Amino acid sequence: MKIGFDNDKYLKMQSEHIRERINQFGNKLYLEFGGKLFDDYHASRVLPGFEPDSKLRMLMQLSDQAEIVIVISAADIDKNKVRGDLGITYDEDVLRLMEVFTERGLYVGSVCITQYSGQESADAFKKRLEKLGIKVYVLYLIPGYPNNTSFIVSDEGYGKNDYIETTRPLVVITAPGPGSGKMATCLSQLYHEYKRGVKAGYAKFETFPIWNIPLKHPVNLAYEAATADLNDVNMIDPFHLDAYGVTTVNYNRDVEIFPVVQAMFEKIMGECPYKSPTDMGVNMAGNCIIDDEVCQEASRQEIIRRYYKGMDALIAGTGTEEEVYKIELLLKQAHAALKDRKVVPASLELEKAAGAPAAAMELDDGRVITGKTSDLLGASSALLLNVLKELAGIDHAVHAVSYTHLRAHETLAISYA
């Protein structure tokens, strides 16, 4: 695999930049941590060389300064929201995250339940955690959030929320998924800290979009493809352009909410420490791209992959035509075509020749292996057997599994399905 990203440089530069931001705010920083902390496979696909657990490893370099607060929405607990990638509910994922962080030597200080309005399921989860010896805090559902800043930043708004007791300079606010209330938790804490005379700060850590590469760079387009279901749109940060005359990239939700966040900062701190959404971020990933063409090509491949994933979801009834249309547009913007992914023409050609569904897989060394549907095997099963034979150096004419065994397995599967 060609490398386009310097992971060691990233770990060093990112941790140093976060330390600088901690010092900027008098040794107390609330860091909203977006995305996946230790299984970021999207980043590893579009930035070849980026390790899926890079962000976790970066935090481990700050382990003596950091504590983690895991946030979960009471609404998500109540509806048993499930992580699509893991198939587990958000409340179960809180326990999984705690275990993983602790195993890696990171300190988890507490869990915070947000958007609470008396849900019995949230009460039960709180009791469950407390029986395990875990500190739990509650943030209440605030009427008029986020636009009624005068009420929100008052004793009747943030003031009613629990104050999360923390002991370390860096407080990492993370969650099982989006919409959990990470930013609200950070701002609520700032309100309480300033009431106590502590001039704490806030920053946001998101890997994508990368702020200091072009708007239509394939890496940023691949982020839009990954969030097609959310309809996130990358855009030029108008506040940054107006303040500094410098073009940077952010995404629509952060740009749209910035005036509200700015007003909250002014009410809490007296003035907003940031002039733009880009200013709030601490992401150094763009500075660690060492081969731009490698990252561009990897991102084009990712957009194609997302297209097929979107098509699969559409057929399964879990996706929409709008998501597929958006990814088709992103393919054009990235100057990519479906045939650019080697497995696509390989599987389509075999399907045409065999008159039945076919599949293809590209190995790390570039070899493309195919498999077709037969009386005994589906395309995927045939493909896996052919890949095993290829890797083991077995002639493809040799039957790795006898006809008799395959037929017996098929009969068993049908009989007890």
Question: What is each PLM-predicted segment?
Answer:
Residues 377-392:
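A short, polar/charged loop-to-alpha-helix boundary motif
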Residues 404-413:
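Conserved small/polar residues in nucleotide/adenosyl-binding loops
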Residues 185:
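Hydrophobic positions on the alpha1 helix immediately C-terminal to the Walker A/P-loop
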Residues 1-172, 189-341, 346-348, 363-365, ...:
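Flexible phosphate-sensing "switch/lid" loops adjacent to ATP/NTP-binding sites
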Residues 375-378, 416:
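A short acidic/small-residue loop/turn micro-motif
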Residues 180-181:
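Conserved glycine(s) of the Walker
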Residues 353-357:
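Short, small/polar residue-rich loop motifs at catalytic or cofactor-binding pockets
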Residues 358-362:
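Short beta-strand scaffold segments in enzyme catalytic cores
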